[in-house]
Amino acid sequence: MTLSGKTIAITGAGRGLGAALAIAAADRHMKPVLLGRNERGLLEIAGLIEARSGRRPDCVICDLADLASVASAVAKLAILAPDLDILVNSGSQWTGGAFEAQTDEQIASVINSTVSGTIALTRRLLPLLSTRPAADIHTVVSMSGLPYARMRGSSVPFVAAKAAQNGFVQALTEELIGSPIRVTSIHPGIIEDVLPTDDTWNEERNASDMLSDRNVVEAILYILDQPANVAIRSLVIERARTEFLS
């Protein structure tokens, strides 16, 4: 399946991995729609994409921790991208530190953005995706969602939320088998943030170096670019000298 011309909605697209994926998708002649809660961040990434491609992507404010914001974002997406082919659930709030130091507000934000908001957004976009001959729902879960991975700086709420998100992906995969929608996921380890616009994007890394956004973005695009008869349901990606499994 060629990705050129595909419309792809990406949550968390105002920074980090989501932003890197949006820029790389545009470089592949896809039509990204940027979703996120920070308007300034979205507009900055949209400007970078326009400067590289000459095409300015649409931006939609979507706070995954706020279900009203999710509903509003979907209503706008239905107008801006009725030909939506791919949803990438990349947005998620993160918190680190000891469990007893977490506030109720932090816990709620992490759980709501990673679990409730992601599930609600996906459910609301199913009717759009179902109209396409072939579509994808891809979720960036993180190794923190795997039962055998160590915490490595993540908080208890974040690990719990990612475990729930992983369960959501597995259940949705089963429910949508036989439909034109593929459900896939990726579980990256710790990532160094770098954008395709940075000089460091093309730097070769050694075995001891940590993952960069480039490594994960290329893996996501590889998964999405598979032929219609192929589904890479789940992929764990960690640096060669792993920290999560030791």
Model-based region annotation:
Residues 136-164, 170, 174-177:
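Catalytic loop of short-chain dehydrogenase/reductase
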Residues 90-96:
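Conserved NAD(P)H cofactor-binding loop of Rossmann-fold oxidoreductase domains
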Residues 181, 185, 203-245:
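C-terminal helical subdomain
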Residues 98-99, 103-111:
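Substrate-binding pocket helix/loop in short-chain dehydrogenase/reductase
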Residues 30-45:
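Conserved glycine-rich Rossmann-like NAD(P)H-binding loop of the short-chain dehydrogenase/reductase
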Residues 12-16:
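Conserved glycine-rich cofactor-binding loop
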Residues 6, 82-84, 98, 129-143, ...:
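Active-site loop of short-chain dehydrogenase/reductase
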